[in-house]
A protein has these predicted regions:
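Short, Lys/Arg-enriched N-terminal segments with co-localized hydrophobic residues
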Residues: 4-19
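Polytopic alpha-helical membrane proteins, predominantly small-molecule transporters/carriers
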Residues: 20-141
């Protein structure tokens, strides 16, 4: 069986470059969204753990901004690498829909691990299906 890496090596150089740019874009968006989720919701876990309960709101905001800095350190390169006008494989709409699917997937995984009381309901699964269909439709020509 031919491995994924070997399959990429068999492709034409320009296709290989596009595939690698797509992979890097998606990996960087995953990293970005992990930081984004912690920036947006990590302070709630810190409050639950009694670490930040006494912090003033401005300290919580500054903490979240500090975490979000690392989100942008991954998100900006992801969009630059992946954008078609920069030689990437994705147009602007495709980048946005991919980012939203990654964002909600990462959020769901983090929420289920960090906040044990959260559960996945049928309507959440239906919403994820709609997102997958959004990805399908945005890639149609």
């Amino acid at each position: 069986m031919v491995g994924f890496t070997n399959l990429i090596l068999l492709l034409q150089p320009e296709k290989k470059t596009l595939i690698m740019k797509a992979i890097w874009t998606i990996l960087l968006l995953i990293v970005s969204n992990v930081f984004m989720t912690f920036a947006w919701y990590g302070h709630l876990k810190l409050q639950e753990m009694k670490i930040s309960s006494s912090w003033p709101l401005i300290a919580v905001i500054l903490f979240s901004w500090a975490v979000a800095f690392f989100e942008y350190c991954a998100q900006v390169p992801a969009n630059r690498i992946g954008f078609i006008d920069n030689g990437g494989p994705f147009n602007l709409m495709q980048l946005k829909v991919i980012q939203e699917v990654i964002s909600l997937t990462v959020f769901t995984l983090v929420a289920m691990v960090m906040f044990k009381g959260q559960s996945l309901q049928w309507n959440h699964i239906a919403a994820f299906f709609c997102l997958i269909m959004a990805v399908f439709f945005v890639f149609l020509k």
